[in-house]
Amino acid sequence: MSAGFVQRHLGPSPAEQAQMLQRLGCRDLEQLLQECVPAEILIDADQARDALPQECDERQALRELEQRAAANTVLRNLIGLGYYDTATPALIQRHVLENPAWYTAYTPYQAEIAQGRLEALLNFQTLISELTGLPIANASLLDEATAAAEAMTLAYGACRLKQARRFHVQADLFPQTLAVLQTRAEPLGIELVVADPAAMDFGDDSFGLLLQLPTASGACPDPTEVIARAKAADVLVIAAVDPLAQVLMPPVAQLGVQIAVGSAQRFGVPLGFGGPHAAFFATTEAYKRQIPGRLVGMSRDAAGEPALRLALQTREQHIRRDKATSNICTAQVLLAVMAGFYAVHHGPDGLTAIARRVQRLTAALAAGLQQLGLDVAAAPAFDTLRLRLDQPNGWIERLEAAGFNLLPLPDGAGISLDECSDEAEVQALLECFAAGCGRTAPAISELLAATPQAKSVGELPVRPAGWLPQAVFQLYRSETELLRYIQRLVSKDFSLVHGMIPLGSCTMKLNAAAELQPVSWAAFNRLHPFVPAAQRQGYDQLINELEAWLATITGFAAVSLQPNAGSQGEYAGLLVIRAWHRQRGEGHRNICLIPTSAHGTNPASAVMAGMQVVAVQCDEAGNIDQADLAAKAEQHADQLAALMVTYPSTHGVFEQGISDICALIHRHGGQVYLDGANLNAQVGVCQPGRFGADVCHLNLHKTFCIPHGGGGPGVGPIAVAAHLAPFLPGHPLVPCGGEQAIGPVSAAPWGSASILPISWMYIRLMGGAGLRQATAVALLAANDLAERLEPHFPVLYRGANGRVAHECILDLRPLKRSAGLEVDDLAKRLMDYGFHAPTVSWPVAGTVMVEPTESESLLELDRFVEAMMAIRAEAAAIEAGLCDRDDNPLRRAPHTLAAVTADVWERPYSREQAAYPVQGLRSNKLWPAVSRIDNAFGDRNLICTCPSVEELARAAG
């Protein structure tokens, strides 16, 4: 009989685990746990085993999940409000969404082995820039509502008038967007002024304007007059735009819009009960250094060839911390890649044809409804119409019985057509309404014959032809060519398909195929987030079970799955703490203590939550300086809101006295926020809710097996103690959250709901005992690497018993003194050895942080040790004067296939040493696509869109 799932999730076999334990001098995994984890917080094995269902095999777990999926009801969703059905091309589903080469990669920090993903993201940025007419577009954000909130805060920060606190919002806006804006605005002291644009009055206290184009009700008025008034008052103009409507509309930049946001969901990304979807954010050159999220830009490599990398990173949270433009790190890369390929697949003509069909069918439907004597509120501009109806609930129920979900309104219903709408569907809608009116439905063929293609979108003219001239959107009309293009990009990218990605604090573990399989089920991915409650019963059961399991694992009382990234979890957790203080009449508490070693998102999130950051020092052992913490807590006792602490620490150790630290903060009136980035070292071993934390965010895309997707999607739920549960985030359209809920932090009630089955499957497959074993093996792998690499690279921090946690920091700073080497030299040379680098220069400059996870085999760990030892030997050759300090395999890394096969080789080391430094690479090697990239050149010469056909032709000439 084959091994069960637990053993296949774990990389080292039982025999290999025994070998590793013997090297560490431990008799078993339980002894290792006792040496790593402080006794005061370590739970026993029986408690971990009994807290959750027992492990099961894939077939059993999938059967149970199929039962939950069957409890969902999938109808044709015409609800709209920013969520629309779409036809995902089978090629994209099979070769991108379901391809581990795309979904198991990490954020492209090591750009030389991420050129494929970066090119796909450049396609997405180019698409958005072409749609909006704005020159700078980022590589995705989390959802449309949070993108709008990011635009608001950018406008607020960019305003030169300190008294300006009024942000004007069009009343006909998606309600979830307005709610997220309200959540974001209140802690920052921003006043939202919601009104019809014609009635807006801009003054010295105004800093921004947000319009929705088309509006939530389906109109598309000409906004140029209100935009002109806003700009005359030095008010920054933002538009939330529908990308499919924007295919037909003039680029909003031509209307005077300075920032455009929206969701690319309807470009081939399933509804997914609300997510994940790629939002976009485009702006002018003036705000390129304030734009939130990742930005892909062109640069050049050491050979002078074009190369892509993440641009302008100095504005991001991992560098600027509390001064960052945003707390966003994880975004929605996999979904942005899908949307970009959707545009490549259809090209500009195909996209235009889809948009025209949707607009024409909507106009024909409106005409047919009017012929039936129904009151269509106004002529639809694009895809949405509103009906005024007597007894609207009866009509909603009638249409639901016929298989259609409409948008319920107090005086009627809304209907939004989409790419999947066709003549038969519109005819069926007309038949249903006609039956309710006691009349005969008009024929859709006759309605279409009387409905010419519109020459406008509402009050705006149609975009002229000639957009999307870039070659990538022109060349791949056949499936054969597009398949080959996708595979060419895959061949340039390093993912878990190729080898270990030992990034510290990132937990690049197995994403099992059985866990991901349900993501493609229609019962999960075709539900609209605002369907009637009776249609989502399967999701309700899954969500309730997953929340209960996560609460049990963490020792907390309640969980919210709404935050759709770890950064959003941090923000939500701090808002919950803030709400609790305010409810107690202590709203003045606004000091957030944060160790200097914390993730950059921590201080950025605290500032977003209206808190003031006070740094706490770390001692020489890498632990929180408890004397400094006590002094700061005492100094700020009257204003102390929270301590943000990562556990195990960002230095890769289980600190002693974590319970005492929590108790200290509580004595001074504060709450403890525990950053769950390192929860993979705690599951089944200790419970933050039991050792003193009040709130914790979890990264389901780390600890609970949702893949990283090359930089998203992620899910960052928060778990809270009982006294904070009433404040869990709510939603304006779907009841959820606590009795005194804070506002939503994401557009959808349960965030990126369609990937929650992945974590459900992981927990169900592993069971309580399996999860504890996974944690123990993660600690085993990290300690094994630490012991084996210590003779070559000093391990910077260890715990009280000489053990590390699930990761370790290797100190490379001595090599700078002895051999003139930088940490980047090792990172780039590791590419030549077939590895992605560990985390570089964080949390300590000049070091690497290694996290092997429980899923890597001993064979892969051996290969990594071999590579690191060989690199150390190369450094030793420099130290001994045997290699030139400036011209050696480390300083010239990585080495491309083009470089080592060039006719001329003038380097003082051999081609073989460059390309095949260890023998195993001869049979299996991913070549870096480009040589080392000049990041500074790219930032000085920012190019973040694809070249057009004409530009390519000029370059070739």
Curated annotation (Swiss-Prot):
BP-aspect Gene Ontology terms: glycine decarboxylation via glycine cleavage system
This protein's GO CC annotations: cytosol; glycine cleavage complex
Pfam families associated with the record: GcvP2_C, GDC-P
Subunit structure comment from the entry: The glycine cleavage system is composed of four proteins: P, T, L and H.
NCBIfam families (alphabetical): gcvP (TIGR00461)
Key word Oxidoreductase present: yes
Cofactor(s) the protein requires to work: pyridoxal 5'-phosphate
Enzyme class: oxidoreductase
N6-(pyridoxal phosphate)lysine found at: 702
GO molecular function, one term: pyridoxal phosphate binding
Cited HAMAP family: GcvP
Recorded catalytic activity of this chain's protein: N(6)-[(R)-lipoyl]-L-lysyl-[glycine-cleavage complex H protein] + glycine + H(+) = N(6)-[(R)-S(8)-aminomethyldihydrolipoyl]-L-lysyl-[glycine-cleavage complex H protein] + CO2
Superkingdom of the source species: Bacteria
Alphabetical list of PANTHER family matching this protein: GLYCINE DEHYDROGENASE (DECARBOXYLATING), MITOCHONDRIAL (PTHR11773:SF1), GLYCINE DEHYDROGENASE, DECARBOXYLATING (PTHR11773)
Family: Belongs to the GcvP family.
Keyword Oxidoreductase: yes
Name of the protein in its database record: Glycine dehydrogenase (decarboxylating)
UniProt entry keywords in alphabetical sequence: Oxidoreductase, Pyridoxal phosphate
Function (record text): The glycine cleavage system catalyzes the degradation of glycine. The P protein binds the alpha-amino group of glycine through its pyridoxal phosphate cofactor; CO(2) is released and the remaining methylamine moiety is then transferred to the lipoamide cofactor of the H protein.
InterPro entries: GcvP (IPR003437), GDC-P_C (IPR049316), GDC-P_N (IPR049315), GDC_P (IPR020581), PyrdxlP-dep_Trfase (IPR015424), PyrdxlP-dep_Trfase_major (IPR015421), PyrdxlP-dep_Trfase_small (IPR015422)
EC number(s) given by UniProt: 1.4.4.2
